[in-house]
Amino acid sequence: MNPNFLDFEQPIADLQAKIEELRLVGNDNSLNIGDEIARLQDKSESLTEGIFGNLTSWQIARLARHPQRPYTLDYINHLFTEFEELHGDRHFSDDAAIVGGTARLDGQPVMVIGHQKGREVREKVRRNFGMPRPEGYRKACRLMEMAERFKMPILTFIDTPGAYPGIDAEERNQSEAIAWNLRVMARLKTPIIATVIGEGGSGGALAIGVCDQLNMLQYSTYAVISPEGCASILWRTAEKAPEAAEAMGVTAERLKDLGIVDKVIPEPLGGAHRNPAVMAAAMREQLNSQLHMLKSLDTDALLARRYERLMSYGIA
């Protein structure tokens, strides 16, 4: 099966394969088969709309992990200019699972911070598959405090299975690093906008997710545990992950209904990985609009709004 497609997209993959075959035949024999190709393309688009209009929570969770889905550095390249990556937590080391630095969004200085999973095997290992260690969160905290000092808005991009649970991370106090970030972000005197672009896994996501405005891409997820992890606890088997995903309410629309998410940003047909440029354009529009709104608030109003937002979690 084409690696671009997940199993529930197989009918789309089959149609795309037929279209490619016809294009090759046309190129080889100079045949005019444009009408047939156009018909199949229309059929493929209609089929895609049908499949993506009825996705289950588990299918959305799998889309959120798609290996070709744009990562933080992809969006940085599309959205920002003058990005200058900053490294290190000034305590232990640099963690490549968190990237961050100064940049400009349509000319406006901002601090950008996000998880980075990696594409190829070596990069995935170097970035620990997007699972930060304490030094990653401490680096993020250092950059956020720098942003406050220079009166720069903070934009975070969330995409992680969770914080790294290894022994070395626990030895360096993983839970303290996450908790400290929550404390600091709740008090920062600068606007914070967080966007879930893929997986939002537990405290590893929340550690850069305390904000004034929370966005989720249409096919992203946000939860305290993975569907497989939940299923393994409740049903003693990861095979119940589809049921767990539905029960947990991990999708953007469900979380919007609960009042946790402020804005669901629609994705291109087939997901963000089908057209990253279009996805980035939609994100740019939202980020600019939200920054304009938040910058109109004075510091006291900004912090009061953030506090009220945090305290409203869990209230029906």
From Swiss-Prot:
Pfam families: ACCA. One of its GO terms (cellular component) is acetyl-CoA carboxylase complex. Its EC number is 2.1.3.15. One of its GO terms (molecular function) is carboxyl- or carbamoyltransferase activity. It is found in: Cytoplasm. Residues 39-293 form the CoA carboxyltransferase C-terminal domain. The keyword Transferase applies. GO terms for biological process: fatty acid biosynthetic process; malonyl-CoA biosynthetic process. It catalyses: N(6)-carboxybiotinyl-L-lysyl-[protein] + acetyl-CoA = N(6)-biotinyl-L-lysyl-[protein] + malonyl-CoA. It is an enzyme of class 2 (transferase). Keywords: ATP-binding, Cytoplasm, Fatty acid biosynthesis, Fatty acid metabolism, Lipid biosynthesis, Lipid metabolism, Nucleotide-binding, Transferase. Its main location: cytoplasm. Pathway: Lipid metabolism; malonyl-CoA biosynthesis; malonyl-CoA from acetyl-CoA: step 1/1. PROSITE patterns: COA_CT_CTER. SUPFAM superfamilies: ClpP/crotonase. Belongs to the AccA family. PANTHER family: ACETYL-COENZYME A CARBOXYLASE CARBOXYL TRANSFERASE SUBUNIT ALPHA, ACETYL-COENZYME A CARBOXYLASE CARBOXYL TRANSFERASE SUBUNIT ALPHA, CHLOROPLASTIC. Component of the acetyl coenzyme A carboxylase (ACC) complex. First, biotin carboxylase catalyzes the carboxylation of biotin on its carrier protein (BCCP) and then the CO(2) group is transferred by the carboxyltransferase to acetyl-CoA to form malonyl-CoA. Acetyl-CoA carboxylase is a heterohexamer composed of biotin carboxyl carrier protein (AccB), biotin carboxylase (AccC) and two subunits each of ACCase subunit alpha (AccA) and ACCase subunit beta (AccD). NCBIfam families: accA, AccA_sub, PRK05724.1. This is Acetyl-coenzyme A carboxylase carboxyl transferase subunit alpha. It comes from Stutzerimonas stutzeri (strain A1501) (Pseudomonas stutzeri). The lineage of its organism: Bacteria, Pseudomonadati, Pseudomonadota, Gammaproteobacteria, Pseudomonadales.
